[in-house]
Amino acid sequence: MAGEPDDVDAMIEPVVPSRHRWLAGLLAAAPGDRVADLGCGTGSTLAQVAASLVVGIDVSSAALARAADVLAPVHGTRSLLVQADLKDPLPIADASADRVLCHDVLECLPDTDAFVAEAARTLRPDGRLILAHTDYDTLVFTSEDLQLTRQLVHAYCDTQQPWMDAVDGTIGRHLVEVAERCGLVVEDVQATVVLSRRFQPGELGWGYAHNIVGALQGAGRTEQAVLDGWLDGLRRLDERGAFLFSLNDYAVVCGRMRR
């Protein structure tokens, strides 16, 4: 990727353990399996899996440092963390992984098909690859200005941030197409909704709203006064108990490439 992302996961991950349990459930790893998480972030999903070895790969040294702290009490010496750019060949041997996960990575990569082929290369013959992604165009906020909220969400979905090599914020709804185009066997398709009813620091809706503001500020796409006014409106809704936020995550469970 173009560079190390800001510490976005630190703001979002702690309040969505259900997302990581969902992903771990899709992996369905057995105690003797080898599991790789491509774009592991701070290790929250790997901490949920049973495996003889977990491998986390991420471009961010800061995320990997946090992942080491998260995984040490769970997996001890059975975890391996590697800093690598996922647009390059993966530092994993052919047919060496029983389970491979890629969550919220594809939108950032310039060649998704090449990456998926690389991920499939690492799978053992009976292995399982999970392609999972948030569809950022499904971000829902109750708002005092519906049209403005729609505009901000769409703009955020389409904004390439400095640490991204590409942007496709709606990739979540296209995962089946990606998998089948790459010759994978699609075994299952699932979705989950993450919900938050408070607009407070540490809550998911608060985190995503401030991510939106930060991204659009950095891109110079929206006036600061407009963004500040939008956040103020969300705070007022929270004070009245009328705030609600949700987003959709999609996942495709895949077997190895068709011959």
Predicted feature locations:
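Conserved alpha-helix/loop element of class I SAM-dependent methyltransferases that forms part
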Residues: P14-D33, Q48
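Class I SAM-dependent methyltransferase SAM/SAH-binding core
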Residues: A36, T42-P89
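A short SAM/SAH-binding and catalytic strip from SAM-dependent methyltransferases
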Residues: R99-D111
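Class I SAM-dependent methyltransferase Rossmann-like catalytic core
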Residues: M1-P17
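A short glycine-rich, Lys/Arg-flanked "PGG" loop and its adjoining helix->strand segment in the class I
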Residues: D113-R128
